[in-house]
A protein has these predicted regions:
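A general structural signal for short secondary-structure junctions and capping/turn motifs
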Residues: 162-170, 232-235
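Active-site rim elements
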Residues: 224-232, 278
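Amphipathic alpha-helical interface segments
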Residues: 167, 171-187, 191-198
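Short, hydrophobic/amphipathic alpha-helical patches that form generic packing surfaces
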Residues: 177-181, 239-247, 275, 279
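Short runs of predominantly hydrophobic/aromatic residues within well-ordered alpha helices
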Residues: 76-80, 171, 175, 234-238, ...
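Cell-wall glycan-active module
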Residues: 1-158, 162, 190-197, 202, ...
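Internal mixed-charge
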Residues: 229-243
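Alpha-helical structural motif
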Residues: 58, 170-171, 180-183, 237, ...
């Protein structure tokens, strides 16, 4: 009859079971939390509590975006989360904050964080800098850290920005810190918030743009009234991250896929992914910590 007798044992073949179970790509909030606190000391209870609350807030959107952008393989998830943990400060900051810039004994240094730059723009009721009294020179000037090391230069005339106002208006926002009018306008078109007929492509190639003279430009640059839409909900915050990697940094996914079963050195792949996303290696040590933790809690290679 084929029935199992009382002295026979039936079980799943372990490796096949794991392969099948892994087809469920949804990550539990506990798993995401372990990744996000990877660079936080166990004694920092308050910080861990803050991160835990943010994980509860964002984990649904994280899973939705991972599936939406086909990032659900183990490698892709690990790198996506490891990189995003650094950009978003473990989900605690979905908008770029500014730092006072000081000169001490002739040396440029970064000072305290500007409090207003940390405030949610949904609470402000507008994008930070829309009011004249909120003008923040951090975004349009050179940026130094507290040790006097140059972080980066002005945002005013890069990434399609058309001056000092744009430098602040299109500051980094979202899980991957979407930055600049170029990337903002592409995302706005993608979401249907802006028509491609409302501006001219490659406006930064206009001779007057190169002269930093927008009023004389013949090419029309995009007009975006509410850049803070990126951070108005958890979905938008994460969606910009998926869009940036797949839409703007497509080769990043191929680099992630090259990280298979320990055949390629972890550090080298993380460095390659970091460079592909950012064009440099800012925060590399932290990116390695978060990505390796993600591999530890998500990865379970089956030969």
């Amino acid at each position: 009859s084929g029935a199992l007798s009382s002295d026979r044992l039936w079980h799943f073949e372990p490796k096949s079971f794991i392969r099948h179970f892994r087809k469920c790509s949804w990550l539990d909030s506990d798993v995401i939390e372990k990744i996000m606190v990877a660079n936080t000391k166990s004694t920092e209870k308050l910080q861990i509590s803050k991160i835990s609350k943010k994980v509860t807030e964002y984990f649904g959107a994280i899973n939705t975006i991972i599936n939406k952008y086909n990032l659900y393989s183990v490698n892709r998830k690990c790198h996506f989360l490891g990189q995003g943990a650094v950009e978003s400060e473990s989900l605690l900051s979905m908008q770029e904050v500014s730092q006072q810039q000081l000169i001490e004994n002739g040396v440029h240094k970064g000072g305290a964080i500007v409090g207003l730059s940390t405030k949610k723009e949904s609470d402000l009721g507008h994008w930070y800098g829309e009011l004249a009294e909120e003008k923040d020179d951090y975004f349009s000037g050179k940026k130094y850290n507290s040790k006097g090391n140059l972080i980066t230069g002005s945002y005013s005339w890069i990434n399609g920005n058309c001056g000092d106002v744009d430098a602040q208006k299109y500051r980094g926002r979202g899980f991957k810190m979407l930055t600049g009018l170029d990337t903002y306008s592409s995302y706005w078109v993608y979401r249907g918030w802006l028509s491609i007929n409302d501006f001219d492509r490659y406006w930064w190639d206009d001779p007057q743009y190169k002269k930093k003279n927008p009023p004389k430009m013949k090419k029309r640059f995009p007009q975006i009234d509410s850049p803070q839409k990126i951070t108005e909900n958890t979905y938008n915050c994460l969606d910009t991250g998926g869009f940036f990697i797949v839409g703007f940094r497509g080769k990043t996914v191929r680099i992630m896929d090259g990280d298979k079963n320990g055949k390629v050195d972890d550090n080298q792949v993380i460095e390659n992914v970091t460079s592909a996303i950012n064009g440099g290696y800012k925060g590399l040590a932290e990116r390695k910590i978060f990505t390796k933790k993600a591999k530890e809690v998500i990865g379970d290679d089956v030969e």
